[in-house]
UniProtKB/Swiss-Prot annotation:
Gene Ontology cellular-component annotations: cytosol
Cysteine disulfide partners in this protein: none
Recorded family membership: Belongs to the class I-like SAM-binding methyltransferase superfamily. rRNA adenine N(6)-methyltransferase family. RsmA subfamily.
EC number: 2.1.1.182
Keywords, alphabetical: Cytoplasm, Methyltransferase, RNA-binding, rRNA processing, S-adenosyl-L-methionine, Transferase
Organism lineage: Bacteria, Bacillati, Bacillota, Bacilli, Bacillales
HAMAP family cross-referenced by the UniProt entry: 16SrRNA_methyltr_A
Family annotation (PROSITE patterns): RRNA_A_DIMETH, SAM_RNA_A_N6_MT
Pfam family, one: RrnaAD
Name this protein carries in UniProt: Ribosomal RNA small subunit methyltransferase A
Domain of life: Bacteria
Protein role: Specifically dimethylates two adjacent adenosines (A1518 and A1519) in the loop of a conserved hairpin near the 3'-end of 16S rRNA in the 30S particle. May play a critical role in biogenesis of 30S subunits.
Record has Methyltransferase as a keyword: yes
Amino acid sequence: MDYKDIATPTRTKALLNQYGFNFKKSLGQNFLIDVNIIHNIIDASDIDEQTGIIEVGPGMGSLTEQLAKSAKKVMAFEIDQRLIPVLKDTMRPYDNVTVINEDILKADIAHYITEHLTDCEKIMVVANLPYYITTPILLNLMQQKLPIDGYVVMMQKEVGERLNAQVGTKAYGSLSIVAQYYTETSKVLTVPKSVFLPPPNVDSIVVKLMKRPTPIVDIDDENKFFKMTKAAFSQRRKTINNNYQSLFVNGKVNKEKILEWLEAAGIDPRRRGETLSIKEFANLYNELQNFTELEF
């Protein structure tokens, strides 16, 4: 029997009725019902028959189905147990799809890649990410040093703009720095609310993040570097000096030391965090080695 694509209002509604499925707001469930949007996502992903895909939050399989037609293998993580029988049904025609009923934030992703995707020449994360945990998912995947070549992911427009933001813009912040430290970022397309069931409260964006061969700057302790950059944006209207001063209010550090540190790195203490490029933050971090009393 021929079925319509899952990513159509007719088929999605039929599946909802068939399984008596009710959306869980707590899981941020919004199913894509526009095949053209999905084709745009797949085109941006440069998928071929040697590509392995990691998908997060497949739902009923609207994106999964189209990925399975283009990629060598698809490994989809779905946290909602209620969707597992639905996916078993909708993915039956595709023997290259593996559905894993786990929370992506708790799963041993390296193990699953070894188990399912080792024969793939390239690995991409392609997903309509759950909006309530988009940032933790991306940071978790990037910071694990997994053999992932890139990401083409849909998310809340505001978050996507922060990932892709340039220095000096309103959206630029600590998330921009982490994303651009590991990847080259670009916007693929803006997605209206109307192509989801149910429609979300916000507009969406598809962002492409391709892994850099090496990070954009040379840092010896990434966690400490990211803590330092995050602190610079703790209160956006404050200067970088004031934000760093507020970290050391216990009095153990002489305020003059922070000024010395900023000036040694060539950073005007009156600047705000959003005006510093990643390279300037790297210079600031590397200068920390000479100021051991400043501990992040």
